[in-house]
From Swiss-Prot:
The F-box is necessary for the interaction with ASK proteins. Kelch repeats lie at residues 131-177, 178-230, 263-315. GO terms for biological process: protein ubiquitination. PROSITE patterns: FBOX (PS50181). It is found in: Nucleus. PANTHER family: F-BOX DOMAIN-CONTAINING PROTEIN (PTHR24414:SF193), F-BOX/KELCH-REPEAT PROTEIN SKIP4 (PTHR24414). Residues 18-64 form the F-box domain. InterPro entries: F-box-like_dom_sf, F-box/kelch-repeat_ARATH, F-box_dom, Kelch-typ_b-propeller. This is F-box/kelch-repeat protein At4g38940. Keywords: Kelch repeat, Nucleus, Repeat, Ubl conjugation pathway. The lineage of its organism: Eukaryota, Viridiplantae, Streptophyta, Embryophyta, Tracheophyta.
Length: 370
């Protein structure tokens, strides 16, 4: 007689315990997420609709500011061929990315922000807090006086009242929450008919003020500018100037102009720019009125580059963007700089890798606080 077949019922799996954080009050969850570094927000947004909505809400950034957990973030204005409209990207930093080791690279990359509309070419891009002001430029091949405000917390844009005058290619700098728009072209040619006025926008009162522009390099185009100690350092093909916007005084600086500085940034009152011809990072100290070369990372950056962009970053660092001459790749490096005994400035490459592939051109880099 055959043995009976015994069929065992499958064991019931215990139900998944509820996520503890989902049991907490909403305000507690907001306070917890506000303390999480932003590099983890893309991962959090994939957990649930609740988290996706939370990390995109203005409230989370208000709490980050309240707790002192804000971070500096980089937004990059990019054109496809230097003739099309501007599209905005942000530098996305992967958590726990590998540090630069000579052969391996981290997974940092430039990510397109699709919710922002195209912006005018060759305008002014100024970051204040969590916002970016976009002023003037070319729109449909016409000079525009339009002003837009980008809210980097929500990646939305709104239109503000126009500038008093339409210009492109101006010198634009921020001093004491006032945006100085100096010169620029009022025709389709960047080299002709430079504007002879200076427009000042008070971001607190939201009012424009027109000032007569001194006859600095009449008929010339300004190529680069930075702010050091409340003064604007500007360069044309022929001269470099140090200008005080309060009394409109302007003095030539022949030592500063001895190098073809371009797309510079400032860290601790020292000007930095990357010399693509000599493949080196140069530093200008206005107190000593002397140029130097940053040491310590020779051979660690791409060579044969056709352009560079630098932007200052938190904690005594700068971010450098490079494009190699024969490749359609944008490289990015984060470099920590320090002044050592004897006055020499040394740099350390924290990481360096390709962040965007394709025939793109970086028009400007803007740092905001989120």
């Amino acid at each position: 007689m055959s043995s009976p077949i015994i069929i065992r019922a499958p064991k019931k799996q215990p139900p998944e315990p509820p996520c503890l954080i989902s049991l907490l009050p909403e305000e507690i969850v907001v306070d917890i997420v506000a303390r999480v570094p932003r590099c983890y927000y893309p991962t959090l947004s994939q957990v649930s609709r609740r988290f996706r909505s939370l990390v995109a809400s203005p409230e989370i950034y208000k709490r980050r500011s309240f707790f002192g957990c804000t971070e500096q973030c980089l937004y990059i204005a990019i054109s496809k061929d230097q003739t099309s409209d501007i599209h905005w990207f942000t530098l996305c930093r992967k958590p726990n990315g590998q540090q630069f080791s000579g052969t391996t690279a981290s997974d940092h990359r430039l990510v397109h922000i699709p919710t922002l509309p195209p912006m005018p070419m060759h305008g002014s891009y100024v970051g204040i807090g969590s916002n970016i002001f976009v002023m003037g430029g070319f729109c449909n091949w016409k000079i525009t006086s339009s002003v837009s405000l980008i809210d980097c917390r929500t990646h939305t844009a709104q239109t503000l009242p126009n500038m008093p005058k339409a210009v492109a290619f101006p010198v634009t700098e921020l001093i004491d929450r006032k945006i100085y728009v100096i010169g620029g072209s009022d025709t389709l040619s960047p080299m002709k008919s430079p504007s002879r006025i200076m427009m000042v926008y008070d971001t607190d009162t939201e009012m424009w003020q027109l000032r007569a522009r001194p006859d600095w390099e009449a008929g010339k185009k300004w190529f680069s500018s930075v702010v050091i100690g409340g003064k604007i350092y500007m360069r044309t093909y022929h001269n470099s100037f140090v200008c005080d916007p309060n009394d409109t005084s302007c003095d030539r600086d022949e030592v500063l102009h001895s190098k073809e500085w371009w797309s510079a940034c400032v860290i601790d009152d020292v000007l930095y720019y990357y010399d693509v011809r000599e493949n080196c990072l140069r530093a200008y100290d206005p107190k000593q009125r002397a140029w130097g070369v940053v040491k310590g990372f020779e051979g660690l950056l791409p060579v044969a580059c056709k352009w560079s962009k630098t932007v200052s970053y938190t904690g005594g660092k700068l971010v450098l963007f490079l494009q190699k001459t024969e490749k359609t790749e944008i490289w990015c490096a984060e470099i920590a700089v320090e002044r050592r005994e004897g006055g020499e400035i040394w740099g350390k490459v924290e990481w360096c890798n390709v962040v965007l592939s394709g025939n793109f051109h970086i028009m400007d880099c803007v740092a905001v606080v989120l």
